[in-house]
Amino acid sequence: MELKKLESRAEFEAWQDACKKRFAAQNRKIFVCCGSVCLAEGAMKIYSKLKESLQREGLLCDVVLGTHLEDGAPGFALKKTGCSGMCDNGPLVRIEPEGWLYRKVSADDVEEIVQKTILGGEYIDRLGMGNGTEVCKTRKDLKFFDGQTRRVLRNCGEIDAENLEEAVARDEYSGFVKALFDMTPEQILDTVAEAGLRGRGGPGNISAEKWRKAAACTDAQKTLLVNDGQLDVGSYMDRTVVEGDPHRLIEGMAIVALACGIEEGYAYVHPQYQVAEFRLKKAKEQAEAAGLLGDNILGSGKNFHLHVNAGMRTLPEREFLKMSANSVHSNKKTWYANSYM
């Protein structure tokens, strides 16, 4: 679906309202986890076969928000999402509004899912998860999700990871638009300080302190550098966010840039995170097309240009980012030697 460039706040809000209505009209949703782990287990084959089967049955398949959906028609949506957790049980398929969750799904299971569940309203026990005594049909029945309150990951697994309209329907870019038109840079910094936000890795630096240092810098040109290629073995924190909700990162970078007086940013993605890199680049292109990145964003007079590069740090973060921005290659031996001293 071609995106129209938005020229004002009013145009953004009208578009967001339309996205919300279309999203709400999808009263039947099928979510196929297409995070890296599920993709390696054949998730795209499942997604493609589901799409073919639904179309063969003559069911309306709203694959992309805003297309193939006539007024009054039942909304039937098929979505490829990012990771929602429980990777050892993938590929995962979830069906709403029942909330039914299937694990270890294969392409061979698709016809049974369509016939029994989609058309017949029947849960397939053999594809369900167990807690030792009974089949757990929904996420609410699983201890894995007990006590979880998702904020950064709120939309991961809930939207198509490659669709800007769905992100906007779930309130993404609303915070940026508010900051853009209703707040001064100092008010943004104060809000971040009051929230008590800290870094999620390393020493857990206070975010507002780092932002204030950048805002106070008087250099003629400042650049925002974001590292999405953490080396914490097995953590995949950055990858999960970028794969499942890339517009969340872009909105965050845009708010930082606004608060600190920055007009250019670089996001570095681990070279092995190919899905994350692809989705972040696609999200960047979508945001540019919609007028949420670039020059004179929404007619505000503010500019922010984003670049996405594949890169991996082998030096402490601050040194790596500065060297990389200046096209200087780091020396692996220096990093490994220092890391054990």
Model-predicted regions and their roles:
Residues 10-13, 66-81, 194-220, 239-245:
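Conserved alpha/beta core surface patches that mediate binding of polyanionic ligands
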Residues 38, 50, 87, 110, ...:
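Buried hydrophobic positions in well-ordered alpha/beta secondary-structure cores of metabolic enzymes
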Residues 159-162, 167-174, 225-238, 341:
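Gly-rich Lys/Arg/Thr-decorated short loops/hinges at beta-loop-alpha junctions or inter-strand turns
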Residues 106, 114, 131-136, 264-288, ...:
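Terminal amphipathic helices with adjacent charged low-complexity linkers/tails
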Residues 245-259:
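Histidine-anchored nucleotide/phosphate-binding helix
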Residues 277-341:
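Hydrophobic alpha-helical positions that pack around
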Residues 34-42, 88, 193-214, 313-323, ...:
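Conserved phosphate/anionic-ligand binding catalytic regions in large, soluble enzymes, centered on
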Residues 1-33, 40-80, 95-194, 262-267:
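Iron-sulfur (Fe-S) cluster-binding modules
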